[in-house]
């Protein structure tokens, strides 16, 4: 006895149907969805029978608009990998049915917007962002329509505004009533190279050049305009700083300390070969302190020091042959070494035997005899081998002149 594959009962009818290599009652061969009798053609999935429409509706390609199956006889439209019914392929904003070949914009992979609605929406958003970014400007003027000759007057102002905006980021959350800044623009390395090359060619580009840069870099023209303003302001600040640094370098590095003294001295007063010569040709700014002569605070440099003869009074204060310090400035009442002053003979006199009728001053040479240099033998037979003006013996009583020690 043959049993039906659908109802599992024996088949007693005169006719039967053979479907999927199994016997069926004629009334049992029907669609499992719509229950219609299948006489000519049927579709099966997982042992179930379907009519053509229900099979493609359940297992065929789904419409991206209504999420329903698409029948093979239906007309469809394709956008990328999506398939739509003709009635489902519409603009999400104006619900206009999109035709073949029409430009459209895809949002969230399954939402489509016609070109007119997209451009209108983008222009509105751009105007809002520009209005929020350009605070305090006239809204009737477009930023790209301004004359490039006005850029210089706005360079420092835009730089200050950028600094103020950067410093006020922390207070944005607190000032809820104030307008918030527009979106920050990040310039990539390739875009930055293009802008730097354009700035090197023309620091003040015209609107036509800015439009070309906007097409090349993909940046907004307002962003490019502000970048050029800030870059010009930065270049001016760098030039000012470099000029100030050059002036400071020239002021501090020039040897000016000895110029007024050289101009005031006569040519005959300089004795480059004497033991107490004036170092007018020395170009250094500083002198090293003397080793043992405290009343000469500054000593001559070793390169141009004149070494006098070994004097007896120098044995107690330092090694023989130590040069005396150079006098840096001429003082009133002090004569240059050309007038035959003998410092050893002056120091040999005690304070009470000074030929000068003036009272002894604390800074005079008369009071510095034995306290500074210690005991010394008489200076009767020693002479200074320095120059022609120092050939006289130190035993001669010199003409004393009052002078303060420098």
UniProtKB/Swiss-Prot annotation:
Subcellular location: Nucleus
Signal peptide: none
Keywords: DNA-binding, Homeobox, LIM domain, Metal-binding, Nucleus, Repeat, Zinc
GO biological process, one term: kidney development
Region (Disordered): 125-187, 296-372
Pfam families per the UniProt record, alphabetical: Homeodomain, LIM
Protein name, per record: LIM/homeobox protein Lhx1
Gene coding for it: LHX1
